[in-house]
Amino acid sequence: AHPESGLAHERSNGGAETATIGGSGFGVMAIIVGIERGFITREQGAERILKIVRFLSDKNTDSYHGMWAHWMNGKTGKTIPFSRKDDGADIVESAFMFEGLLAAHQYFIKDNPTENRIRGMINNLWRQAEWNFFTQGQDVMYWHWSPNNGWAMNHQIKGHNECHIVYILGASSPTYPIAGSVYHKGWASANTFLNGWEYYGIRLPLGDNNGKGGPLFFTHYSY
């Protein structure tokens, strides 16, 4: 993890300062597992999570309508472009981050200063995430937005793939929820959503027929 932010590094060759938001969400989940398996103490895990949420909550850390970029500088909190036009919010990577943060919110429930701060900061971050902004007023969600390039990436999120968690979190937001029609007409509308074929005697409900439902990370990332 990055020594100042606590965020996960982007692979071994991503540079000393490049942190990945989605991978950091997985890291938060791994910290909880590490506590349960006895690899670290609850107190050690709580301090690591607190470092992450402090960094994400800092006013100098870039966020866009409550979402983060795919990559950011783990020291300064500034966005590192993933590609030429992908230099702002990535709601899929942000959803993976929130997946971990919300699990931590429900795990660290003791009444002590550290765990109280963790829950309070995560709750603030969760309530600031503007999921409905990323629909552009349409019945589908868009993967990217940036102040420099707006909606230029123009990547609609449709299923079935690793992005299901985006719609789940968007629908459950207490402050900026998406409408039900966004799920049904957006995520569930693609011809790669429903399957129903049998492979090796197992009926597959969702996923692309050509790829036997797709790779396992389609399921792993959201569930």
For each feature predicted by the language model, list its residue ranges:
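Extended ligand-binding clefts on enzyme/binding-domain cores
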Residues: 62-94, 107-223
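Short glycine/serine- and small hydrophobic-enriched flexible loop segments
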Residues: 28-36, 99-106, 167-170, 223
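Surface-exposed patches in mature extracellular/periplasmic domains of secreted proteins
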Residues: 3-10, 39-45, 65, 111-118
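Second-shell loop/turn segments in exported
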Residues: 14-18, 35-41, 84-88, 208-212
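Hydrophobic core segments within long, regular secondary-structure runs in both alpha-
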Residues: 28, 46-57, 98, 119-130
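Post-signal peptide N-terminal segment of secreted/secretory-pathway proteins
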Residues: 29-78
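Low-complexity, Ser/Thr/Pro/Gly-enriched N-terminal "stalk/linker" regions
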Residues: 1-19, 63-72, 171
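Hydrophobic alpha-helical transmembrane segments
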Residues: 22-26
